[in-house]
């Protein structure tokens, strides 16, 4: 199997191309979510179908991520990265001119194919060009770009929709994508690159694609379709299990695997990957719950939610360069443990929010979470790959990033189901106290009827107001339960830290392998 060769060319140009591409791809994931209601209104799409705008992208994204290392060896960094940027840019333009929901979903799938390649490839390009002594700061700078995207996405999306239309959340990618593709093509030099001549593992690629698409569909649509009460979900779940298990067995047996699972023989890597899965669960599922709580309970607009994340996450931008310097100078396991405690604490704080939460109460958990993520992000990657051979790190890095994405998808599906079921159960429990003969209920009912005394039927209006208050209280309790469940699940990840081995070698070398 051909080894990845060092990259030459303009360091500034390569940095600009890598950062622009990564920032664009990461922003696009979050910027679309704030536009779903406008897209739905534009196309007249049913509420249960509009989610395919995000689902189609996610399916393509998770399929391409583990294959990116193979494509890099096959076509080279410059050709693959520039080609992925152009595909992403073209698909963005097509999304803006989509004429109905099916056409938009198809174009989003094309966009996901390009986007799934951009993040891992831009990381490899950046660390392939910088000398080892500069890898620590290069990693911190890249992390800043990757983290800035989710913070800016909702804010930029909300502004564009307010002043123009949803079409511009896609059109804004066109000049950025063209610039990044042009700069990468003229800057990246691979004079010693020789394309891999290994046979194409068509069977492995096919099994992976079918399995990941089926799995992502189940995770995205399962709660909406009643999970295993729907035969389509049952069929696709079985398809995902059969294809992915067969894929793993096939990759372990074939002499030229498209994804090398043998890296899991390394205990430290396996523990770090499991921990990364839980990080993805806590991060994405926690953000999902927080945004949903702010929107449904506190009635925040999408732009207001984006500003909440922006105000609470500035500490992350300051912490990343500091952590980049600490990696290798102190025991990375201590940094990871501190980060886990911070993320767990933020989920615990979220678990005590109420319908009366003010801006300070909403911002504090985001601040604490950002602090924890700042300490966990880079050292976890370094520890994961520190005990692996350089030839193993390509597949290992792809799998490592994929587990975080899968953790987010599974965690979000889990929390979506939990909130629905918990809210119903809490509403049933609270209804037992809505007894007309209960003195406390009678007092609250009189207050409610007094609040609507000027309405035509204050008695019935009072009962309706009490019912809405019970619904709201049940929803708040459901969200609290979801956050606290996530906190408990993520706190368990502290035990995985004991399985991590102290990295050997220079921080620069390890940081290079981590990316």
Where are these regions (language model features)?
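Helix-loop-helix hairpins in multi-pass membrane proteins, especially solute transporters
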Residues: 65-205
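C-terminal membrane-cytosol helix-exit motif in multi-pass small-molecule transporters
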Residues: 175-193, 210-221, 239-253, 493-501
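Short, Lys/Arg-rich, polar N-terminal cytosolic tail immediately upstream
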Residues: 1-7
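Transmembrane core module of solute transporters
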Residues: 10-85, 92, 102-104, 143-145, ...
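Small-residue-rich alpha-helical segments with characteristic i,i+4
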Residues: 137, 142, 148-154, 158, ...
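Hydrophobic transmembrane architecture of multi-pass small-molecule transporters
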Residues: 35, 49, 179, 404-502, ...
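Residue-level hotspots within transmembrane alpha-helices of multi-pass secondary transporters
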Residues: 34, 66-67, 151, 155, ...
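Short helix-capping/hinge motifs at transmembrane helix termini and TM-loop junctions
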Residues: 99, 131, 187-190, 223-224, ...
């Amino acid at each position: 199997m051909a080894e990845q060769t060092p990259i030459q060319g303009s360091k500034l140009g390569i940095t600009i191309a890598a950062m622009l591409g990564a920032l664009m791809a990461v922003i696009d994931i979050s910027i679309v979510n704030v536009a779903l209601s406008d897209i739905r209104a534009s196309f007249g799409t049913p509420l249960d179908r509009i989610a395919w705008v995000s689902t189609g992208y996610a399916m393509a994204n998770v399929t391409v991520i583990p294959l990116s290392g193979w494509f890099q060896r096959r076509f080279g960094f410059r050709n693959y990265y520039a080609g992925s940027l152009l595909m992403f840019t073209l698909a963005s333009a097509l999304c803006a001119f989509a004429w109905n929901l099916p056409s938009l979903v198809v174009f989003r799938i094309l966009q996901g194919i390009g986007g799934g390649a951009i993040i891992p490839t831009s990381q490899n390009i950046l660390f392939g060009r910088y000398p080892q002594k500069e890898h620590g700061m290069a990693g911190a700078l890249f992390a800043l770009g990757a983290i800035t995207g989710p913070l800016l996405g909702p804010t930029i999306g909300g502004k564009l929709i307010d002043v123009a239309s949803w079409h511009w959340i896609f059109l804004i990618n066109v000049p950025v994508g063209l610039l990044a593709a042009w700069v990468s093509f003229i800057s990246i030099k691979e004079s010693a690159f020789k394309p891999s001549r290994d046979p194409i593992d068509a069977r492995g690629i096919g099994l992976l694609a079918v399995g990941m698409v089926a799995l992502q569909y189940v995770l995205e649509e399962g709660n909406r379709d009643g999970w295993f009460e729907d035969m389509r979900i049952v069929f696709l779940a079985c398809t995902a299990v059969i294809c992915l298990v067969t894929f793993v067995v096939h990759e372990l047996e074939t002499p030229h695997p498209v994804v090398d699972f043998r890296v899991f023989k390394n205990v430290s890597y396996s523990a770090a990957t499991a921990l990364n899965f839980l990080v993805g669960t806590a991060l994405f599922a926690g953000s999902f719950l927080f945004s949903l709580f702010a929107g449904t309970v506190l009635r925040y607009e999408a732009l207001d939610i984006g500003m909440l994340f922006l105000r609470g996450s500035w500490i992350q931008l300051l912490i990343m360069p500091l952590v980049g310097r600490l990696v290798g100078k102190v025991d990375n396991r201590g940094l990871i443990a501190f980060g886990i405690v911070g993320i767990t604490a933020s989920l615990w704080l979220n678990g005590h929010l109420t319908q009366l939460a003010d801006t300070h109460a909403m911002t504090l958990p985001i601040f604490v979470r950002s602090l924890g993520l700042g300490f966990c992000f880079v050292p976890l990657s370094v520890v994961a790959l520190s005990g692996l051979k350089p030839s193993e790190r390509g597949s290992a890095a792809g799998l490592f990033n994929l587990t975080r994405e899968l953790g987010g998808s599974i965690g979000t599906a889990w929390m979506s189901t939990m909130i629905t079921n918990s809210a119903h159960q809490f509403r049933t429990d609270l209804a037992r106290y809505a007894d007309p003969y209960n003195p406390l209920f009678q007092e609250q009912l009189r207050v409610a009827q007094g609040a609507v005394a000027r309405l035509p039927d204050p008695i019935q209006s009072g009962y309706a107001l009490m019912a809405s208050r019970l619904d709201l209280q049940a929803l708040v309790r459901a969200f609290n339960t979801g956050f606290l469940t996530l906190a408990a699940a993520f706190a368990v990840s502290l035990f995985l830290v004991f399985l991590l081995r102290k990295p050997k070698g220079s921080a620069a070398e390890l940081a290079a392998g981590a990316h």
